[in-house]
Amino acid sequence: MMADNSNQPREYDAVLGGHSQIPIAGAVLGGIAGVKQRFNSPSIEARIAAVKDAPKYGGAGLNLAIEALLDPAAEVQRVAYLILRSRTEPLVRQALKDFVPYKLFDCIRTVKTGTNVAISPGGDRTASLHGKIIRICDVDTGEILYTLEKYPRAQETFVLCQESEVFVRSRNTPKHRAIEIWHEGELRHTSLGHEGEITAIVISPDSQVIASGSADTTIKIWNLETGKLMCTFGSLLTWGAHKAGIVSLAFSPIAQTLASSSSDGTIKLWNLRSRECSQTIKGYANCLAMSPDGQTLATGGWDRNIQLRQLSNPDSSITLAGHFNSINAIAFSPDGLTVVSASADGNIKFWNASTGENFYTLSGHQSSVTCLTFSSDGETIISGSIDKTVKTWGVN
């Protein structure tokens, strides 16, 4: 049976009675008392060492690690967060729920890719164009999972499904405007119907339907499983439809509402059950996102600003200003408390969704950031850029 050495001196243990050497009459504080003494030190290194030791001392140690999340030094916060995030104790989970880790984010992985990058909603896979080939790759390793050929002289837009196995792309040629649904590299369905260039595609969070928007001013809803057209929102069929080409689309989390923006200067909300336009908001938007509770709409534009609107009162909005170029993509954190934006200025910004405060900025891409998403657990974000890289950002 090993002796309990928890009270024996360790590196950074506080010594009473001296500074440079342990005096004969000095006393060394060990155990949790020593950890607390080191944690109260002005030395960042001493506080980090204390936090690393803290979990050895049960509940008292965990309380100290939780307290370290509020330390003024980001280095100490980072160590505490990395120690605590895998713990399951209710007290720890609550503390992490109240903690915002994004201000500790750095680039933890960079993978070379192609152009026209798309990222799956969970951040597991990417699709990108490499010359005449579209590659679908694993985000973590960069491994090529399968490839597809690009159509000659065709303009293409593509998206990946939540489950990642499904790949959807638009094919715009002078003769054809088609939606193609692929499963692990095998073409399942080709859906025709748009008369103009297909400019936007989005898959519902429940992976049941696809929405496509076109320069022909219409929005079409397709069944993802069968490829069949379910309905069309257009000026000839629907009251309140857009009068110009569609720019961007976004589903609500439970896929009951679709948001659309158009070059006609309006943003519209569509009720997918009644198949009616439920709201029209004046404004231009290059990209859209809806909060996890479906109550807030975020819009980003060429004016470099982001607008947050409560759908219960869409005429009132919070403006998020700080980017130096147009906004290309927006996402909400899984808890809905943080908005993250990607811009043509090459930066990624984090915003408090309630106050509009920009509390952190990530720089690392060498060119315009075109897409981003949160990982399913919210612990990382994945971004794609014109610089032909996909970056994963998290606490390292």
Model-derived features with residue positions:
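WD40/WD-repeat beta-propeller blade N-cap
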Residues: 108-114, 149-155, 192-198, 233-246, ...
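Hydrophobic core register within WD40 beta-propeller blades
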Residues: 117, 157-158, 201, 249, ...
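Extended repeat-based scaffolds of very large eukaryotic assembly and lipid-transport proteins
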Residues: 1-111
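Short coil/turn segments within WD40 beta-propeller repeats
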Residues: 132-134, 174-179, 196-199, 216-220, ...
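Hydrophobic beta-strand positions that form the internal "hydrophobic ladder"
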Residues: 126, 166-167, 210, 258, ...
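Short loop/turn segments that connect beta-strands within beta-propeller blades
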Residues: 139-142, 182-186, 224-227, 272-275, ...
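Blade-level signature of beta-propeller repeat domains, shared across WD40, Kelch, NHL, RCC1
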Residues: 370-396
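Residue-level detector of Asp-centered blade-edge/turn motifs that repeat once per structural unit
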Residues: 121-122, 162-163, 205-206, 253-254, ...
